């Protein structure tokens, strides 16, 4: 996404539609972000300027990419927010980030992605800071988002339960190195790398312990 500080060293290529994103200027990357590449962050509170109401962020983003009027932006966002179960869109847009729950902020980011219609959505640990009920609801919204838009999604997560529910293919990394890549079914049923087997076995052990506890209650 080109959001790292200039002094952070990066190497390699990131190819998107035949173009190396690492070679683009900030001005060129700014055009890609939002329209082509959209990122949904782990902490919704950090995704929005705390000194501005939510609507300011949404209007600035959509006006920059589409040149829409405030009225058109409100209409577009109202429809998108209702589709992710957020009612009273105008009221929400007039609130500050700290006045909304983590789950609501995640849904606002998903609604914004619906309006932007990017080619790729990068979701970085989007359910980590949420309670179990909010996690379930947000994952369902991600699945609907992918189905509705037909876009590609890179979903970064340590939660294998969420990964199993939302992913088609899994890429396992350890210390920044790719150690295994395969379909969801193969990774969970026949993991090849020792580290992947460790992750999957721990997940199964937790699930079995939970089932045993529930059976005793």
Which residue stretches match the model-derived regions?
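A short, proline-enriched helix->beta-strand linker immediately N-terminal to the Walker B motif
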Residues: 115-119
